[in-house]
Design a protein with these regions (language model features):
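Negatively charged, low-complexity tracts enriched in Asp/Glu with abundant Ser/Thr
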Residues: 1-47, 60-65, 69-96
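Amphipathic beta-strand/beta-sheet edge segments enriched in Tyr/Trp
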Residues: 48-56
Length: 96
């Protein structure tokens, strides 16, 4: 399932969805909890990225993430956020 498919799903259920987390980091340590055994995996110094996690209310296991990466570590967080939101808007329009 590609990002456009996921965006379409998000749009279709947006009235039933919560935005779980929006991240906008130049450098980050990312923690991923594996659902099967509750192990916590730790990733250090990932590339700059912005992510938005969307999932239906009370159904965290159905969540999915949309990531946009940017290789320029000097970019301002606000600029990254604007870039992300503009890109997200364009992708949503493409789903029509």
């Amino acid at each position: 399932m590609d990002i456009k498919d996921r965006l379409k799903i998000a749009r279709d259920i947006q009235d039933k969805c919560l935005v779980h987390k929006i991240e906008c980091d130049v450098k980050t340590t990312f923690y991923d909890i594996e659902s099967e055994n509750n192990n916590i995996r730790k990733y250090h110094d990932m590339y700059p990225y912005i992510s938005i996690w969307i999932f239906p209310k009370n159904k965290r296991e159905d969540c999915f993430s949309l990531y946009l990466w940017n290789d320029d570590e000097n970019i301002k967080e606000l600029d990254k956020y604007k870039y992300f939101m503009n890109t997200l808007e364009k992708l949503i329009k493409e789903c029509d």
